[in-house]
């Protein structure tokens, strides 16, 4: 690409990729007017009318994106899957979304060598770590799919907190989906099972099933409520009619007492975070009409200023707090949303997004990008991977991803 010899339409170009986008459905929805933004992008750029591209095998994220970057098949560029075998260690797999495995040249190296400033942002195939030391190259992550920083910066999982006057004590339940497609549910462990009646009461507000219906289903051998089993090897859980990729905590709701500053009619509950290693406290507050519709979360009852105040139905973004992961403390940001609350304050559901380390710069090149992004755009945004049919949870997930897209836009 020589500027003095080739006539070009623009000195700036953007290559935009969307993982898993079906070209047939996209073309159909563009033509039907259902994807106006994609239509604008198509009108501004270049692509086949049917949007079909020549892919490669296997049809999974890392090799496909690397093929797009290098113009070579996986058998040539070397990134063939999410993981790879390690010579001499047949019982171990290595992470494969790693540019150091590349045996082909990605396009951005060619751009930088031709004198063009190039930003590679969240390209999950051959982008990280940088394979070019040019001062024209800027890289923001690319170490994993999901969203920017999802592998390197996430220091706590998403969490659903349920509180009710019917719950006897605060309990933390580690997430049931980690790297599996289906949850690991451990059943029939002797003498270490919660009482089914307590579980039914405590989780009724999450499942939408009353205790009688829940008991009937349990008698049929169908696990539809949260049942916790704990042994020396860990936890297995299931919550409601959806399987979750997040942790869960439940808490009793009581009359507020012992606070430095709390209204006389306030109620309180406990937030167990980070596998129960961090405890926060919440006040349930009335509005002017005497209806409970707001939650305020504090570090402790001694504090007079809350970490966050959550009116029902409104996402609160970038709440900064401590997070503990693997015995290390991080200063992290996450979002809070009070999804529902009963008018009498007897029951509530609170969603917390994953937490992101605000001081991590390990997947940015050059590292000064971390400070520039933090000051001009904001903390790296959490992502959401809730696979659920619950409408409230779906809406919360959409709001989390909308914020991710806003962050991307501001970054550009």
Regions found by a protein language model. Name each.
Residues 1-9:
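A short acidic-Thr-Gly-centered motif at the start of a beta-strand
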Residues 5, 17-21, 47, 89-90, ...:
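Generic signal for short, ordered secondary-structure residues
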Residues 8-27, 41, 68, 111, ...:
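Beta-strand elements within well-structured catalytic alpha/beta cores of enzymes
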Residues 22-24, 62-67, 355-362:
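Short, mixed-charge, low-aromatic patches
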Residues 25, 33-37, 63, 106, ...:
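Extracytoplasmic/secreted proteins, especially bacterial periplasmic and envelope-associated proteins
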Residues 25-29, 130-133:
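A short acidic (Asp/Glu
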Residues 26-75, 117-119:
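Short, structured active-site-proximal loop/turn typified by the sulfatase FGly-forming signature C/S-X-P-X-R
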Residues 73-411:
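His/Asp/Glu-rich, glycine-adjacent segments
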